[in-house]
């Protein structure tokens, strides 16, 4: 109560922020006459002037009012559009490492031009991040005339570009592209074999459109680049034939319960698990197919791979539905993004799940993949010096943006008041009754000429509703992952008089629905339109626009509540843009996924006891509140998944930073002979310690063993026993020095034979190739450790602490192995110039030609495992991505200085 009173007196934090920003808006508006008086050439010269002032010590904040006034004036001249005051406020929020919530139709694309221009003045590059290629290309082309007028270069980064094109794209002042492509380019750059193969510059400023979709919805799925592993497609096919023979076990208190089944399904956690009865039955089936030995168990250590195949097959059959989670296209399984409804060609599920789904659908099974590089969006975007984002729906996730990314959310007021009417939810007992009510609502809208947008949560539901409308002779268009190519055209005309559009998840569509249809799209279809034709089309559109306004504007129908309130708000937000009238209503049934999983059985029982007749619905604020509480539960659980994923990935991220930093230093250094010398002394010293322990008696020495080891590992044939026999005073330290001297002489002799330059190039090539091979193996080891670490919870140990400790041990072992392998190769090999060229060519071919897969890994199962093991609370993460100094503590957690720990390689 006291906090509410204080808010009324001094305003909310959001109000105070807006009040401060409005003062700067007044400054910008006061400059407008001054900039209007400038000629085009004088206005264009401002960019060079600002850059010069930056070099002389002024800051971007000091330049902001003038820079924004410059862009606003240029926009008036190039586009005939003037930035509203609320767009200036949004731009200032975006420039200050915050998230701007701007409602649909408020001009986010135009708003982004202001902070993009300001931050591009530094010459360090700006990345404008969108959720798909279509929007990246569209926004780049739409804003190119404005930026070109101001002397800025613009380019677009999309899949399918070669390295040269990508390098040009990143060299531009402002680069538009998708979150996936920026992330994968970062990983590819850290797999390059020469500096010329890298395409990205240091990461400066990222401006993320639909920021909630990128940083929250997709944060659960790490970006993974993988290469082919061994082929096991036959086993997937054999296991796939067995899964349909298993019987699902239902809850004992349900009508479907028929006794103990073979597996249980946990839809909430996306898990399918064999029961004890199921384990016995599966073992019998496997033995019958000669996949398991008679006396063997599925859970023995030798059958881990077989168990993995069974689990993948079970999940494929029970949790992943065709036309909901994926579609079959050209004999391939194509994943459907659950958040945007878009297909993701080229993306594959990990952990053998994709192969299991391929076996289930009878399409060609592609090889399993081994991880070569991976990163989460959370850790990728925290690499930028400045990060900001905009979306129509961020306020419900403001806590997460602050907790994970350290980004505050500011709600930007609309330019015109919002007049959309949001009606209460209608809840029916069955889906059939719900769809009947939806059809009647649509029929009423069509009769009065009101356009309707119907939102569904899956392709399957959109096609089901489309079939019902077709039977009822109601003309309509369908917008889902199957009809990608027609997407922009369908959205552009969804505001036509009486139009009916069915759409899977509207998040990220990025195209405004203009009431009366999009007259600009009609003009674009004409070849060289005359002024008269344009005027006629505009006049005809104005008539249609007024008719649609009179009919009530765009009506939104939700056929099901999504698991996130934010996605529901995105659907609603398609209506009521720029003060237009509109309305929205959600129709639900007790058979909907969200209601079935999270709404209690008591609600269904209560509805039946109330004597509800067929076709009747419940509409009450209590019901709507109960549904929102269910959504909050899901949102909280998904937040836990994302935070848990980040906590585990942060361990790998610390190691990734060390490896990638060392790798980049290797690429940029032509001479690593000093590093090789230090490593060689370390490796020889460690080997000598094994056979001649420090400060030990001579009787404890294993000299013959040391001789054999030096020869086998390093090609070093030294008569150690003869040396000791000839020299009584050859003590431990002297012997060490003599061995190292001999090793150094032999290496120097090798350098004389092949030449300094050839050996330097060979050292670098060997170091890179060995590091990449070991890093790949280390990632696989980390994956295996990650999958089983939750079991430590049963032993009353903290799985995260155990993971940190063991991953550090693995990382230390990897670096020791790297030093030993590099020294061994360089010592034993007989180098010739053509060997160096062959090795470099082999690396180049591997880099360019190796088939790679770009995937999103599933994360739900990880959280389910951790919940089962009873994990402890989470920690808060803040942005902290500074470059590691040589005297800083090593990020691996050892407590040593970086230069004395994992920095010693470089």
Curated annotation (Swiss-Prot):
Membrane topology qualifier: Peripheral membrane protein
Region feature (Disordered): 839-896
UniProt keyword Oxidoreductase, yes or no: no
Residues reported in the UniProt entry to bind ATP: 87, 105-109, 512
CDD domains: DEXDc_SecA (cd17928), SF2_C_secA (cd18803)
Keyword Thylakoid among record annotations: no
Job description of the protein: Part of the Sec protein translocase complex. Interacts with the SecYEG preprotein conducting channel. Has a central role in coupling the hydrolysis of ATP to the transfer of proteins into and across the cell membrane, serving both as a receptor for the preprotein-SecB complex and as an ATP-driven molecular motor driving the stepwise translocation of polypeptide chains across the membrane.
UniProt protein name: Protein translocase subunit SecA
The organism of origin for this protein: Aeromonas salmonicida (strain A449)
Lineage, opening ranks: Bacteria, Pseudomonadati, Pseudomonadota, Gammaproteobacteria, Aeromonadales
Gene: secA
